[in-house]
């Protein structure tokens, strides 16, 4: 990183841009907590995120710094800070770029579950949907050719996943001891990971093929010797993935699939579905997107209770055989008002979860958001049984600067 920054001495001056956001959030749980030590009712918190960017006058050199922090009144684990992004990027005159530092990379096409999105670790204290990610240290070389784009990654500095604390909601029956992770076999915190991705457009097809070898971002768990907590266990895995999207007028056909080895038996998982958009409904400028997806996961999962070092199972998942349906409504107004709602049903036991999200800009610098998640008819053997009392409603007000 320092060597890369040394090259800036010969670059033109450029300009700095500074922005960011501060938000106040209130989350309400209408049902009493299911487990001891968990709080009831209200969970107020606040976040601050800065955004500092510099680009040289010739556009070849770029610096991005995006720190993030949250202060939570109920869950100590949710009070945390992270460098979401902090990198230097060089853009050549020809067809390649080089990025050095911490960054966020997104792969995927579907709505319900991002199977192929493997580069960044999930910031699990932020929300249950796994959309929030921690910054990942990396060296990324991107080649932009006529035959497509090739991204090559070297990923030092593994990030462990964050989880709610003993007093937090949306957790398992036993809290997770994030201070004592276990790295099995060749996995270790300092191990270097590697990844590559090829992507391109072929007519109406958008295709991505990826490979990853390194420490899994998705831990399995074992019970701590005290019996009072779970310990996350991180394995070394090799994963290949494919994501596709086909555009046909108002139809978007989407799919993601992975094959993973290193966590029990090698297994396949996939998500496939569509989004169909109805334009200008009710003779208004509103666009309604209708979504449907099927989720399959063939892993042999479960708690790992055997002695460390024996053959491991894969991390457990709630998506072995599920159907997701949803709707996305864009009002296309000057306030960027939008809504998204979805329902997931477990085909095997009929457990059901749903969410509703809505947001609207207030003036030039403010945004209001509402989010609700609900759990219905949850089977006691379903992974969601630990959060069946954790229906919640969140209101968030953000000021941009």
Task: Label each region the model flagged.
Residues 58-61, 250-345:
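Detector for outer-membrane/organellar transmembrane beta-barrel domains
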Residues 20-22, 65-67, 100, 141, ...:
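Membrane-embedded beta-strand positions of outer-membrane beta-barrel proteins
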Residues 141, 274, 387-401:
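Outer-membrane beta-barrel "beta-signal"
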């Amino acid at each position: 990183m320092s060597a890369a920054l040394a090259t800036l001495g010969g670059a033109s001056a450029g300009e700095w841009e500074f922005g960011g956001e501060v938000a106040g959030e209130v989350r309400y749980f209408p049902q009493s907590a299911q487990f001891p030590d968990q709080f009831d009712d209200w969970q107020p918190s606040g976040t601050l995120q800065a955004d500092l960017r510099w680009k040289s006058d010739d556009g070849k050199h770029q610096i991005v710094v995006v720190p993030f922090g949250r202060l939570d009144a109920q869950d100590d684990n949710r009070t945390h800070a992270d460098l979401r992004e902090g990198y230097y990027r060089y853009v050549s005159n020809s067809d390649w770029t080089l990025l050095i530092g911490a960054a966020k990379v997104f792969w995927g096409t579907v709505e319900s579950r991002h199977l192929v999105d493997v580069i960044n670790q999930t910031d699990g204290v932020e929300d249950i949907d796994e959309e929030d990610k921690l910054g990942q240290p990396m060296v990324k070389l991107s080649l932009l050719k006529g035959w497509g784009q090739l991204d090559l990654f070297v990923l030092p500095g593994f990030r462990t996943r964050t989880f709610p604390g003993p007093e937090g909601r949306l957790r398992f029956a036993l809290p997770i001891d994030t201070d004592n992770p276990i790295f099995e076999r060749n996995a270790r915190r300092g191990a270097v990971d590697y990844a590559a991705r090829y992507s391109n457009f072929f007519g109406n097809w958008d295709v991505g093929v990826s490979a990853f070898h390194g420490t899994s971002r998705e831990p399995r768990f074992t019970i701590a010797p005290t019996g009072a907590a779970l310990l996350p266990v991180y394995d070394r895995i090799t994963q290949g993935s494919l994501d596709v999207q086909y555009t046909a007028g108002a139809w978007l056909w989407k799919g993601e699939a992975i094959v993973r080895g290193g966590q029990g038996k090698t297994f396949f998982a996939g998500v496939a579905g569509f989004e169909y958009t109805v334009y200008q409904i009710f003779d208004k400028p509103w666009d309604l997107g209708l979504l449907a997806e099927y989720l399959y996961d063939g892993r042999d999962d479960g708690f790992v209770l055997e002695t460390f070092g024996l053959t491991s199972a894969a991390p457990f998942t709630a998506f072995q055989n599920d159907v997701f349906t949803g709707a996305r409504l864009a009002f296309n107004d000057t306030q960027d008002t939008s809504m998204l709602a979805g329902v997931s049903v477990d085909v095997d036991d009929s457990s059901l979860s749903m969410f509703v999200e809505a947001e609207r800009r207030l003036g030039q610098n403010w945004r209001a958001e509402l989010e609700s998640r609900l759990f219905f008819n949850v089977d006691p053997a379903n992974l969601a049984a630990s959060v069946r009392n954790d229906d919640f409603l969140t209101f968030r007000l953000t000021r941009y600067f």
